[in-house]
Amino acid sequence: MVSTKFLNKLKNEYNIEFNNEKLLEEAFTHSSYSNEHPDDGIRDYEKLEFLGDAVLELAVSNYLYRHYPKLNEGELTRLRSNIVRTEGFSEFAIECGFQKEIHLGNGEEKAGARNRKTLLEDVFEAFNGALFLDQGMPAVERFLHLTVYPLIAKGEFDDSRDYKTDLQELLQQNGPVNIEYSVISESQLPSHFVVELKINDQVQTQGEGHNKKAAEQQAAKAALQKFE
C-alpha cells in the first residue's frame, strides 16, 4: 500500500485524491514485485506506463502549441523531446515523492533500481496514466501545471541556444580564458541546483535550474548578457 503520508502529500500539494486507489498502487508496482507477490493481486505498471507516455506527450504538445505560437514544427518537436526525456521525468518523480512509494522485488531493490532514472521515468508516466484513467485529462493538466509547466515557462528545457558554447567563443576571441562552473547549492525535494560561474578565478554570475546542466546554462546566459 502507498503510505498515508504520500496520500496526504497528493491531496495537500496537488489536490489529488484517487477514486480508485488500486490504480495508484498499480502505478507504483514494478514487475519484479508483482512476480514475487502474486497473491497480492496487484498488476505491474507497464500498461499504465504505456498509456501515460501517450497522455504526457499529448498534454505537453498541447501546452507547447498554445504557449509558443512563434515556434515552427521542428522547434516544437525538439522542445517536447527535451521535456519528455528520461532525465526530466525522473527528477519530477523524485520531487513528487514517488521514489519512496515504488514496490520493488528484493533483487531489484538490492540492485539499486529505486534510483534508476529509467525506472523513475516509467513510474512518472504510469502515475499520469493512472490519473488519466481515474479522473481524465483535466486532472492530468492540473497536475502538470503544478509540476512540469512552470519549468517549461522558465525556459529550462530550451536548448535552441547553447549559452555555454556561445560564452566560451565570445571570451576566447582574444586568447585562452579559464571558465569554471561550480555547484554551490543542491537540493533534491524539489530538485534545485545553484551554479556559480567563474572567469579566470573571478566570480561573475550564478544560475539556477532543476538540474546541473540547466543551472549552468542559466549562469552562462547571465554572463553573456553581462559581456555582450
UniProtKB/Swiss-Prot annotation:
Keywords: Cytoplasm, Endonuclease, Hydrolase, Magnesium, Metal-binding, mRNA processing, Nuclease, RNA-binding, rRNA processing, rRNA-binding, tRNA processing. One of its GO terms (biological process) is regulation of gene expression. SUPFAM superfamilies: dsRNA-binding domain-like, RNase III domain-like. It catalyses: Endonucleolytic cleavage to 5'-phosphomonoester. One of its GO terms (molecular function) is double-stranded RNA binding. Residues 216-228 have a biased composition (Low complexity). Residues 7-136 form the RNase III domain. It comes from the Bacteria. The active site is at 53, 125. Residues 162-228 form the DRBM domain. The keyword Magnesium applies. Its EC number is 3.1.26.3. Mg(2+) binds at residues 49, 122, 125. It is found in: Cytoplasm. The keyword Transferase does not apply. Its cofactor is Mg(2+). PANTHER family: RIBONUCLEASE 3 (PTHR11207:SF0), RIBONUCLEASE III (PTHR11207). Digests double-stranded RNA. Involved in the processing of primary rRNA transcript to yield the immediate precursors to the large and small rRNAs (23S and 16S). Processes some mRNAs, and tRNAs when they are encoded in the rRNA operon. Processes pre-crRNA and tracrRNA of type II CRISPR loci if present in the organism. Belongs to the ribonuclease III family. NCBIfam families: RNaseIII. This is Ribonuclease 3. It comes from Lactobacillus acidophilus (strain ATCC 700396 / NCK56 / N2 / NCFM).
